[in-house]
Amino acid sequence: MLFAQLNEYMAEVGLDASEQQKKQLVDFVGMLNKWNKAFNLTSVRDPEQMLIRHIMDSLVVSPHLKGSRFIDVGTGPGLPGIPLAILNPDKEFVLLDSLGKRIRFQKQVQFELGINNISSIESRVEAYQPEELFDGVLSRAFASIQDMLQWCHHLPKSDGCFYALKGQLSEDEMANMPQGFRVTDTIELVVPKLDEQRHLLRVVKQD
């Protein structure tokens, strides 16, 4: 059932994946649903809604990623990082979260589903100092872009960028971009079966 729905949704937005990748995505929903009962990883309880609100909501970002090394800050149970890693095995994803139960879940997903291009790290973002900087800093966890840039400013390479996953856009937020940063793209995302606004903002540092 979920497999057929995933096929339909991915075709609707023009995304390609192998049968193995689709199986990993559906199995991820199964693990999230199972672990959620004990560990309260997401407020979404229904697997069909997880497929829409977590899997497809993450995957529609994929065509807009530039580079090969990414960090997902405040990833929770691995969103959007794990679906994006499954769809992009040639890219590397670091999943950062400060809560141990979320990291344990991610590591179990990595083990059970055989995902080799993710690293899960338990840390607060301000305390995390990567050995190598990132092409892209992703997050759907921050309430405002200002917060994201304040806490994550040390993570991208000089030519890297921030990818802020947002719902409805706030004019105030867009008008009050912190000094030294510039929005290069505002992309309206379409998620199948989701009648809510979704946007991706690409932000770069200015010299």
UniProtKB/Swiss-Prot annotation:
Which keywords annotate this record? Cytoplasm, Methyltransferase, rRNA processing, S-adenosyl-L-methionine, Transferase
Among SUPFAM superfamilies, the record links this protein to: S-adenosyl-L-methionine-dependent methyltransferases
Q: Which GO terms describe its cellular component?
A: cytosol
Q: What is this enzyme's EC?
A: 2.1.1.170
Q: Which pairs of positions does the record mark as disulfide bonds? A: none
Q: Which residues bind S-adenosyl-L-methionine?
A: 74, 79, 125-126, 140
Q: What does this protein do?
A: Specifically methylates the N7 position of guanine in position 527 of 16S rRNA.
Return the protein name: Ribosomal RNA small subunit methyltransferase G
What gene name does this entry carry? rsmG
